[in-house]
């Protein structure tokens, strides 16, 4: 197997954005859920750790925003994205505004690695014969 490994340093804000984009892509979040995930991650980063970790996040909507801060979306849009995060196991309701976080998707570390493996699809013998006739498949014999 061949591997290409690159390391990039990012500031705190950019790191959270890159992390959110990688997780969103891996889990196939729609655009609204991606934006809400980013907002929830930002809120999680502000959550104080207790006993070395933070296992939940307060998501209280008031004053036209999340925790009173404008996040560039309406409450209805936020709730739609939150619904997808709940359905996909990113968070779980603890109370009306407090949510357990999935520790595999929320952390306060300083590094992350996303690995996507590509595998060559095997061809059937009929497909292989047709491709070989076209000179498009090298058969190992």
Spell out what each predicted region is.
Residues 44-100:
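Winged helix-turn-helix DNA-binding recognition segment
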Residues 1-2, 101-103:
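Positively charged, low-complexity terminal tracts
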